[in-house]
C-alpha cells in the first residue's frame, strides 16, 4: 500500500472526527466507520494480490468474495455520493477541503480495488 494513501486516510479520518455537523454527527460517524472499513478491505485485497498463492485460500475461505467486492463498490458509490452532497451543502472552507480530499481519496481507492480485483480474477 502506498504510504501517501495511508497518511491520507489517517489525515481525513482525523479531520472528519473534528468536524461538528450538528444533528448529522451520526451520519459523519457512519462515514468515518465506512472509510475505516474500506481501508481495511483495500489493504486485505492488496495483500492477497502480493501473495498470489493466497488467492486460492481466499476463495476457499470465502466463496462469496465476489459478493463482498460488489458490496464494497456499492459502499464506495454511497460514500462518494454522501461526500459530494456534504461538499455541496457546506460553507465552511475547512470542511470543503476535507470533503474534497475525501472524494479524491475515495476515487483513488475505488481504482485500486478495481485493479486488485482484476488481478485476482
Curated annotation (Swiss-Prot):
Main location: virion
Domain of life (superkingdom): Viruses
GO cellular component terms, semicolon-separated: host cell nucleus; virion component
InterPro entries to which the protein is assigned, alphabetical: Flu_NS2
Short sequence motif Nuclear export signal: positions: 12-21, 85-94
Gene Ontology terms describing biological process: exit of virus from host cell nucleus through nuclear pore
Record carries keyword Transport: yes
Pfam families listed in its UniProt record: Flu_NS2
Record's miscellaneous remark: Average number present in a viral particle is estimated to be 130-200 molecules.
Membership in a protein family: Belongs to the influenza viruses NEP family.
Quaternary structure, from the entry: Interacts with protein M1. May interact with host nucleoporin RAB/HRB and exportin XPO1/CRM1.
Protein name: Nuclear export protein
Organism name: Influenza A virus (strain A/Hong Kong/156/1997 H5N1 genotype Gs/Gd)
Amino acid at each position: 500500500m502506498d504510504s501517501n494513501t495511508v497518511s491520507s486516510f489517517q489525515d481525513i479520518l482525523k479531520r472528519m472526527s473534528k468536524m461538528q455537523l450538528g444533528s448529522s454527527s451520526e451520519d459523519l460517524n457512519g462515514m468515518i466507520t465506512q472509510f475505516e472499513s474500506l481501508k481495511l478491505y483495500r489493504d486485505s485485497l492488496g495483500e492477497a494480490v502480493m501473495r498470489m498463492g493466497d488467492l486460492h485460500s481466499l476463495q476457499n475461505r470465502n466463496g462469496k468474495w465476489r459478493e463482498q467486492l460488489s458490496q464494497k463498490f456499492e459502499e464506495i458509490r454511497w460514500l462518494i455520493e454522501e461526500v459530494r452532497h456534504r461538499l455541496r451543502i457546506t460553507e465552511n472552507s475547512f470542511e470543503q477541503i476535507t470533503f474534497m480530499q475525501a472524494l479524491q481519496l475515495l476515487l483513488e481507492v475505488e481504482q485500486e480495488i478495481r485493479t486488485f480485483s482484476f488481478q485476482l480474477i
